[in-house]
Amino acid sequence: MIQKIIFATLLSFTVAIISGRFFIPYLRKLKFGQKVREDGPKTHLKKSGTPTMGGIIFVVATFLTSLIFSPWNKYLFILLAGFLGYGLIGFADDFLKVYFKRSLGLRAREKLLAQFLLAIVISWFIKSNVGTEIIVPFFKRSVDLANFYIPFAVFIIVGTVNSVNLTDGLDGLAAGVSTIVMAFFAMIALFLNDVTYGVFSASLTGGLLGFLRYNKHPAEVFMGDTGSLAIGGAVATVALLTKLPLILPVLGIIYVAEAISVILQVFSFKLFGKRIFKMSPLHHHFELSGWKEEKVVYSFWLVTLIALFVSFYSLS
């Protein structure tokens, strides 16, 4: 099994590296450039026009590698449904942005409706195939959610998808953090002796590493919602299948911090007319506090790496 995981990581990495060399110039030719928000950090305005929808690079690499090395079973179908399904929602959003040359694609209501409907379907399949028990980290026990499982799973999926999306705001940030997160699940799959979960997680890990070659600062391409929503769908789905959704607040501490910073900022401004952060999500607060973009990114990677070890400890 470990050989399959290693080969899956290497193949997906290679596919992402090679495909990126051809796909990024093609995106430039199509003029699929990202329109940067004018109300964001001024240092980001120079990034306007950078090709977006680059998430296709690691989505395709992960999909092909998973088909090659993983058994074709219902669990792979569920993983790919979460991964590709949310990737398609993101693709639709990205396409509308670049086609109409605007910073917003799908309406928020449309995007959320699609996310919730897909989450309900995926949650039902997970419940039907792995049951309703989840593991509680640090306490070495499991809890049966019974009839509360589907609402809980829907919350986990939609919450994770949007949290990853919020994290994707700096060069290499979401890709690097998510590489570490998916590497964790690849290692968990080794302990579970589950080839399907292991190959899929390793494939996405390798694909993201290859994508980082082009997404690190200064980024040649952005993953767009195509990539960030696909990652969120993958992270949430594999966490639920392995019965480890409660590990996400620890392992995905950066995702959680980014999302909470936005929620707190909105509530504080609406209730008190004051902002807690200089700008949200959290990574922009650090930028406006004088941190260089690379320092923010590397610091968030380091926090996630520490969170990985804490997550393993919580399950030991």
UniProtKB/Swiss-Prot annotation:
Pathway: Cell wall biogenesis; peptidoglycan biosynthesis. Catalyzes the initial step of the lipid cycle reactions in the biosynthesis of the cell wall peptidoglycan: transfers peptidoglycan precursor phospho-MurNAc-pentapeptide from UDP-MurNAc-pentapeptide onto the lipid carrier undecaprenyl phosphate, yielding undecaprenyl-pyrophosphoryl-MurNAc-pentapeptide, known as lipid I. It is found in: Cell membrane. Its main location: membrane. PANTHER family: PHOSPHO-N-ACETYLMURAMOYL-PENTAPEPTIDE-TRANSFERASE, PHOSPHO-N-ACETYLMURAMOYL-PENTAPEPTIDE-TRANSFERASE HOMOLOG. This is Phospho-N-acetylmuramoyl-pentapeptide-transferase. Its cofactor is Mg(2+). It is an enzyme of class 2 (transferase). One of its GO terms (molecular function) is UDP-N-acetylmuramoyl-L-alanyl-D-glutamyl-meso-2,6-diaminopimelyl-D-alanyl-D-alanine:undecaprenyl-phosphate transferase activity. One of its GO terms (biological process) is cell division. It comes from Caldanaerobacter subterraneus subsp. tengcongensis (strain DSM 15242 / JCM 11007 / NBRC 100824 / MB4) (Thermoanaerobacter tengcongensis). The chain crosses the membrane at residues 5-25, 52-72, 76-96, 116-136, 145-165, 172-192, 195-212, 221-241, 244-264, 296-316. Belongs to the glycosyltransferase 4 family. MraY subfamily. GO terms for cellular component: plasma membrane. Its EC number is 2.7.8.13.
